[in-house]
Amino acid sequence: MCMLSWFISTSPLKEYCGGKRNLQRNNF
């Protein structure tokens, strides 16, 4: 789910995962 939000910056999941920046750091 979090990975999907990374591709869709406008997705509400972005906040749920902790933001696109944090998500990018966690996955990569």
UniProtKB/Swiss-Prot annotation:
The protein's organism comes out as: Saccharomyces cerevisiae (strain ATCC 204508 / S288c) (Baker's yeast)
What's the protein called, per UniProt? Putative uncharacterized protein YLR149C-A
